[in-house]
Amino acid sequence: MACSWAIAPVCAQDISQIAKSDPLIITGSIGTNNTYFHSSAGLGYMSPLSNSFFANLNFNIYGFSMPFSIYFSNDNLNFSYPQFSFNLSPSYKNFTAHIGQSSMPFSQYVLNMSFNGVGLEWRDKQFRASAFYGVLRRAVNDNPDDPTVRIPQYRRYGWGISAGYSKGGNSIDLYFLRAYDSESSIDERWRTRVRPQENLVLGLKGQLSYKNFLSLAANVATSAFTADRESQQVMTDEARRFDKIFETRYTSRLRFAGDATLGLTLKGFNASIFYKYIQPDYVSLGTYYTSNNYHTLGLSAGTTLFRRLTLSASFSGQEDNLAKQQLYTTRGYVYNAMASLRISDRMNVTAMYNGYLQSQGDGTAQVNDTTEIHRVLHSFSLVPTYNLPGELFDHTISLSANYTENRDLNKFSVGQTDVKTLALGASYNLNVKPWETNFTFSLSHQNTKGFNSEYSSDVASISTGRSFLKEKNLSTSATVSLNYNEVRHHSKSLSMGVDLSASYTLKKYHSFSLGASFSQYGDVNLEKTRSTLDNRDVRLTFNYLYTFTLLQVSAKKKDKKEQKEKGSKGR
């Protein structure tokens, strides 16, 4: 038997709500999942019998949740216990304090991770301000001689402030972040391989609106980043002007990131233009990761005509290698269009197009015509639907068609990576109201052609479902399917399947579910007189879950009791 332990966090609500919370609630659940599987083709890829049992117990004390759980599956045992990690956020009038593992709203280019420390926010109708200090990242300091040693990392501290103002559709926010690694937080043997870092980030975010139809939003940031805090310091007068908050070293660099959006909103029409620019090697130690070394320009527009026709389209282009230091420059263009027509209250037709174009240009090296990356992707879709409601029956018919082409545009290409796919589908749903039963019939066909290869698949299925009993707590469903697959000049296969399921809920605490599936499949060849459709798979499942409340001390009952005692004393 193998044992392993996991950590489950302890959660806490706003401290201002603790007095209103229930003093003690003990809840839990017990359950089991069981699967039996048999295949005439062998059991090499799945165990014939899989059993699991689990139990959960949660102690909630004045809003603090401490979960315990145990899980047993065949020969594996897992036990999880709570780790005390607090997050208190008391509020008083316009102030909110943060204690423990917390997060605060900052610019995405400045800070998007949580911190373990203290913070304070102040907000009124127009003005706002915040500040925090804490640990942004824990140290990883394993023994270097351990064969399973993790990648080391320093403990990272950070502090930041923000201030903002907003009125109507106009706003402005200023952000400041200072982050640095603690050199003594890892073993000396690691320090030659991993160097401590330091960062100073200044961000500005704002929005301007004109008469509710024209808006301009911008989000920019400048980052001063040092890759090695122990590298030699730059001693020039200009570099030492900001020594009190950031020491400029020979491993320091200054980078910029930002985006802007101009939007137009009119009656029945909207449009926007978007631009983003992130310099190479832009880093903020307050973010998990920021993609850099690219710029993007995008356009989008949409309108509604005659209250029936909805049109939308968008285009965006992206290019990397801004510093021209990569071997090659990659450009990508994404474009799409959509039209939806409501022919009547019962019928609707939607058509869509999506495209992508990728090309490669010169960088420090010149692109070779024979190996140049130049691809295009086209995708066309058409989806008509028809609904016919009635007193006894509801009918829904849906059709779908999609064609996708992925093609190499290199003039020396012979089409080895070209792929064309055609997918067709049809479904009919019948709702029999007197029986409270649904029936669904569906057909689908897919054909994919590649270089000297072709694959096709045809699927037909019938399914039904119904709920029983007065409370509708017994649900059943059944599906019968037929699937034919063919790889041209290689293989043909046919499979037939039946799936049955039932679920029952008893008194809202006990949940039972049963499932059974049977499939028969094998290779078939229509040119031969005999097929090999003799493989069978059988799967049976049984699941059970019991949820309970072991103990509950209610705050409301306690308050009523105190009021009753006070009233009796008064009398």
Regions found by a protein language model. Give the residues of each.
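Transmembrane beta-strand segments of Gram-negative outer membrane beta-barrel proteins
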Residues: 14-41, 47-48, 59-68, 90, ...
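Outer-membrane beta-barrel proteins
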Residues: 104-110, 150-152, 189-197, 248-250
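Bacterial N-terminal signal peptides
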Residues: 1-6
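Transmembrane beta-barrel domains of Gram-negative outer membranes and organellar outer membranes
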Residues: 41-94, 104, 336, 340, ...
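Exposed, low-structure sequence patches enriched in small/polar residues
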Residues: 42-54, 81, 163-165, 172-184, ...
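Outer membrane beta-barrel
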Residues: 71-136, 264-270, 277-280
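Sec/Tat signal peptide C-region and signal peptidase I cleavage site
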Residues: 7-12
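Internal, well-ordered domain-core segments that constitute the primary functional module
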Residues: 114-193
